[in-house]
Amino acid sequence: MKMLVEKIEKKFDQEKVIEEFEDLTKDAGKIQEETLKKILEQNGGTEYLQLWGLNGRTDPQTFKNCVPIVTHNDLEPYIQRIADGDLSPILTGKPIETISLSSGTTQGKPKFVPFNDELMESTMQIFKTSFAFRNREFPIGNGKALQFIYSSKQFKTKGGLAAGTATTNVYRNAQFKKTMKAMCTPCCSPDEVIFGPDFHQSLYCHLLCGLIFHDEVQVVSSTFAHSIVHAFRTFEQVWEALVVDIREGVLSSRVTVPSIRLAMSKLLKPDPELADTIYNKCSRLSNWYGLIPDLFPNTRYIYGIMTGSMEPYLKKLRHYAGELPLLSADYGSSEGWVGVNVNPKLPPELVTYAVLPNIGYFEFIPLGGNLNGIEQANSPVGLTEVKLGEEYEVVFTNFAGLYRYRLGDVVKVKGFHNGTPELQFVCRSNLLLSINIDKNTEKDLQLAVEAAAKRLVDEKLEVVDFTSHVNVSADPGHYVIFWELSGEATDEMLQDCCNCLDRSFIDAGYVSSRKVNAIGALELRIVKRGTFHKILDHFVGLGGAVSQFKTPRCVGPKNSSLLQILSSNVVETYVSTAFC
């Protein structure tokens, strides 16, 4: 581990990193076998693997014959014992010392996931590989990154293990900062801002640091596109206060955390000239179009995860970015990494991820038309056996104690990089709007919202954010869509949007069910401005990190606190007449 850090710190050799990646992917099948063997040799003596009778064998066939495919629920009791302080080799040979929390935005509560040195090492490998391909197409010099990153506090589990979100565990690791420095993208903001206890204050200071180092900013990034859009929506509200801070060299009283105030006082000096420049730029912008390149003229690109539930934010992000390219970050989850973006010139909507064959052992459940993948759960195919154009659910085995673990993601094979597949993220397999025979995915919801939102364009209105819910307490059950708008719209327009939403779900099961009233009329509920910000605040209040926040696109019945926030902020309700 120490050697890895020293190697990164010494010099970042872009061509060598690319060469190593090419070698790994040329013989992906062999690398996969070696990776599985390594995982099983390290962990073969664990309670979990002993249970399935591997008896020291490390070949893929025996592994697949003996060890079952599982979901998080199956492993949860084992992980809980680790978190509670059981030091016996339960899932891994070496004790787990850190626990990651999943975002919790999908299911309503965070999951515990083991985190160890090997996962950190694969994170750095992903970062380095991605940067090498990115830097080849969009080279940057010595500068800084305006990174809207926020680290929630780590806490101790009942058994004394450090626990925090996956992003927190990465940001707090010494390797992270060294790697960023080696890749010429150190963060503009001091640690006190990144690790601040109040994300509103941290965000304000991230923006201020970006302005202080405006000429040095080469990359604007965050874990997710949502955080970048949220940051610049906030900038629209606070820019004049930021200008005053820069003009006077004194930090606004809105920042109250002593450690942040002290750190910022070392950076902030009176600069009337810069204050005038920023004021003039902001005053002449048309509806904030091209805000990012105007404020940070040496920025090469915007970087963050932009697929899946982040796609709805791309329109606003492009508005802020002007002509700057949007580069989608890599494919992973709290449980571990899957693939790296080696084609950074592709727009986010078309981005693919080449699977790294040495960071885990990968299997793929063929889906056909069955999004739940249950029927095929016993017949997954290997990394090199996937077929072009087919959709699969990802199953992986990693170095941190997850064995044949269903990630819950649906991917499509779009091509191959040497011997490894290039995957396109399709949707979360469990994010379905479904009442009976209808099946609508997150992508279907997104397309329906996009179609309906076009009716708002002429009025210069936009959908700020959205989510959905299946109301089965009514008979017949029906879909409920929640919208937050940027301004006021007429009843006539919103009724039209509601009907358009209903018609835009083109799944055959939905349409046929609507026609015979087996599914009731869709409801569009408009919520107050700031409602989705309240959802973000609620998530952070539960210990989540802003960097990991994803607006849940479907709120299930168990997520009662989110439903309560949404329901208590509804200002108008419209019922579809599309199938009357």
Curated annotation (Swiss-Prot):
Jasmonate binds at S103, A329, D330, Y331, G332. Pfam families: GH3 (PF03321), GH3_C (PF23572), GH3_M (PF23571). The keyword ATP-binding applies. Induction: Induced by wounding and oral secretion of the herbivore Manduca sexta caterpillars. ATP binds at S100, M120, T123, G164, N169, G332, S333, S334, E335, G336, W337. One of its GO terms (molecular function) is ATP binding. Keywords: ATP-binding, Jasmonic acid signaling pathway, Ligase, Nucleotide-binding, Plant defense. InterPro entries: GH3, GH3_C, GH3_M. Catalyzes the synthesis of jasmonate-amino acid conjugates by adenylation. Catalyzes the conjugation of jasmonate (JA) to Ile, Leu and Val. Catalyzes the conjugation of JA to Ile that may mediate defense signaling and resistance to the herbivore Manduca sexta caterpillars. This is Jasmonoyl--L-amino acid synthetase JAR6. It comes from Nicotiana attenuata.
